[in-house]
């Protein structure tokens, strides 16, 4: 509209001679009505209001529900003393004003209670249209109407929808509007909450390295479960189901072979809804103990064992408990032996039957992982012969109870409760090539291109890391680590033993590459600084590099100076006597200038004490620069 004529209308109304009256507009419910008539002093409407509608246009835009009355400027009004001073342009601005009549009953969680048709985006972040960047469903606006959205609360009383509510719908009930004769209702779908309630989620015993949406759950085999209305489908079995048929353990078969025969594996993690009901599970276990069918399936070997009789589920089929994943604390793969130990600790896990939909997939995964683990171990053909040489004569540092050709059943039963998953493929421990030295070196660091370290008997080795395992020697391998208390009598014997062992090692590693050469101990010169070394314990580090004695000693001393600067023997030392204690000062300085300044100030042998002339004898200084600073700061000189 053109607002330039507003000034002209105000000038007419402000003129005292014209007495231009203004009508009185007031609210009546939700409508604006004209209560009084006024006169225009013979002026036409087009002269005062050039932009006013004509009668035909007014009839077109007016609605019968509004009950608007046409303003007649020629009508006279006698009593207009109580009229408010309104501009002639203001009452023509028929602007709808929203009135919240039912403000107390508004839903505080629905901010857009009266959505306007001109709104492009809603203010409700929970609406699906907001997430899809679409327009909000339009509802006709009116005067005094309150389109209040009524949300349906969940049945369980929580703020989050349950899994049974497949379609999350919020209906908007709109009251009859003042200027519209129809009821408006809008329905919008709300997505499930980002964080579901704890009652609808099972404890997942594995961790994914990637983030999944809230509707996608991966089972134990890595497959994505079906996505339907329920984002968390967990088909928990009933508690009163029949137990699985038991199996009998043959005494002739080993535990590992019996576990390998049973190849059916579950597909997903265990459901916590079934494990939480401890009382029902105990009752079901007690019922299983009294059943005759379970007692008949128990073999005589297990009947003799009281622990097996107390818990007959130990002999059940391992289909119900053999899972690829363990509890929440351990997400690694478990071998059948380690799984049996976990089953003995948790009897509830064994009683949980799992579906066999992904048995083949899980079995293939387990076989692939077992093959990958076996590829890291030495093969059977390379057990006795390592790199073309027979190493069965080489003794091992392991304990004697481990050195046996095959693990018997007793040792397997003793190793079952171990926390770490055991290796499914066992091989002879003594066939592993051991180190020549009896030190605690990591056996995994021994590679075909890395020869063993041989040190002659006249060399003392001081290792920086402490020994973590005791050194075990045997009659076949002499002691190559003599201590400092060795006398000169056994030195030739040790030297000959070391030479003989060195020849064996050379013959063993003669097929290696040409760049790996074992150093000759006869050409190795080891220089050790004397007992007068200035260390804390009187010991000095040993450098076994084949260099000269003077070079090694100088390098070791230079290294100590670099890393032990505070404890080094400096180039200059103060030998003057301290006047207070009467002892030698022995202060070490790295520069001669620092030593001279120290002697001139602390000991004051060459220069007198500097006194302040202004302060007198009260202030005296041992250094001249201190006196100059005092005069500048205190006295302004």
UniProtKB/Swiss-Prot annotation:
Record-annotated disulphide pairs: none
SUPFAM superfamilies in the cross-refs: beta-beta-alpha zinc fingers
GO BP term (any one): regulation of transcription by RNA polymerase II
Domain of life: Eukaryota
Keyword Zinc-finger among UniProt keywords: yes
GO CC, any one term: nucleus
Gene3D superfamilies recorded: Classic Zinc Finger
Listed InterPro entries: Zinc_finger_trans_reg, Znf_C2H2_sf, Znf_C2H2_type
Zinc finger map (C2H2-type): 572-603, 610-635
Gene Ontology molecular function, alphabetical: DNA-binding transcription factor activity, RNA polymerase II-specific; RNA polymerase II cis-regulatory region sequence-specific DNA binding; zinc ion binding
Amino acid composition bias (Basic and acidic residues), ranges on this chain: 279-296, 345-355, 404-413
Keywords in alphabetical order: Metal-binding, Nucleus, Repeat, Zinc, Zinc-finger
Localisation: Nucleus
Protein name: Zinc finger protein rsv2
Organism (species): Schizosaccharomyces pombe (strain 972 / ATCC 24843) (Fission yeast)
């Amino acid at each position: 509209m053109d607002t330039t004529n507003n000034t002209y209308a105000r000038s007419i109304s402000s003129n005292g001679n014209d007495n231009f009256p203004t009508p009185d507009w007031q609210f009546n419910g939700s409508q604006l009505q004209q209560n009084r008539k006024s006169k225009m002093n013979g002026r036409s409407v087009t002269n005062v209001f050039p932009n006013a509608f004509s009668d035909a246009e007014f009839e077109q835009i007016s609605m019968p529900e509004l009950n608007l009355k046409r303003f007649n400027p020629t009508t006279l009004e006698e009593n207009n003393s109580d009229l408010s001073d309104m501009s002639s342009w203001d009452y023509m601005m028929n602007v709808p004003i929203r009135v919240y009549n039912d403000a107390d009953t508004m839903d505080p969680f629905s901010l857009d209670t009266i959505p306007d048709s001109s709104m492009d985006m809603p203010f409700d972040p929970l609406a699906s249209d907001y997430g899809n960047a679409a327009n909000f469903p339009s509802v006709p606006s009116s005067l005094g109407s309150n389109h209040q959205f009524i949300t349906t609360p969940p049945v369980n009383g929580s703020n989050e929808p349950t899994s049974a509510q497949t379609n999350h719908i919020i209906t908007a009930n709109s009251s009859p509007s003042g200027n519209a004769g129809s009821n408006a209702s809008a329905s919008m779908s709300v997505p499930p909450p980002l964080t579901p309630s704890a009652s609808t989620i099972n404890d997942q015993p594995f961790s994914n390295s990637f983030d999944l949406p809230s509707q996608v759950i991966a089972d134990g085999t890595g497959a994505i479960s079906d996505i339907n209305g329920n984002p968390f489908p967990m088909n928990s079995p009933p508690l009163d189901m029949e137990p699985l048929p038991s199996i009998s353990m043959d005494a002739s078969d080993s535990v590992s072979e019996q576990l390998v025969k049973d190849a059916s594996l579950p597909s997903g993690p265990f459901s916590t809804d079934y494990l939480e009901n401890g009382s029902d599970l105990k009752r079901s276990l007690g019922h299983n103990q009294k059943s005759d069918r379970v007692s008949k399936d128990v073999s005589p070997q297990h009947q003799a064992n009281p622990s097996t009789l107390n818990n007959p589920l130990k002999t059940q089929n391992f289909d119900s408990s053999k899972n690829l994943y363990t509890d929440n604390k351990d997400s690694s793969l478990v071998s059948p032996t380690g799984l049996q130990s976990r089953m003995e600790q948790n009897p509830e896990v064994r009683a949980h039957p799992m579906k066999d939909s992904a048995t083949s997939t899980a079995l293939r995964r387990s076989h692939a992982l077992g093959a990958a683990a076996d590829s890291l171990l030495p093969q059977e053909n390379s057990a006795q012969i390592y790199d073309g040489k027979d190493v069965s004569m080489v003794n091992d540092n392991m304990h004697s109870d481990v050195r046996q050709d095959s693990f018997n059943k007793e040792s397997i039963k003793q190793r079952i409760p171990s926390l770490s998953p055991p290796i499914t493929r066992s091989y002879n421990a003594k066939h592993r090539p051991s180190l020549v030295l009896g030190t605690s070196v990591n056996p995994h660091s021994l590679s075909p291109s890395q020869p063993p370290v041989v040190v002659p008997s006249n060399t003392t080795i001081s290792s920086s890391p402490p020994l973590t395992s005791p050194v075990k020697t045997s009659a076949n391998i002499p002691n190559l680590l003599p201590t400092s208390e060795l006398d000169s009598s056994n030195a030739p014997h040790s030297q000959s033993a070391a030479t003989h062992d060195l020849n064996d090692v050379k013959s063993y590693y003669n097929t290696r590459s040409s760049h790996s050469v074992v150093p000759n101990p006869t050409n190795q010169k080891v220089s050790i600084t004397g007992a007068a070394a200035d260390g804390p314990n009187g010991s000095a580090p040993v450098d076994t590099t084949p260099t000269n004695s003077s070079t090694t000693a100088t390098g070791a001393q230079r290294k100590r100076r670099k890393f032990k600067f505070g404890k080094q023997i400096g180039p200059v030392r103060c030998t003057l006597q301290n006047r207070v204690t009467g002892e030698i000062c022995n202060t070490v300085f790295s520069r001669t200038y620092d030593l001279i300044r120290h002697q001139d100030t602390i000991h004051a042998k060459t220069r007198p004490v500097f006194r302040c002339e202004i302060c007198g004898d009260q202030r005296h200084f041992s250094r001249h620069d201190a006196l100059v600073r005092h005069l500048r700061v205190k006295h302004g000189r």
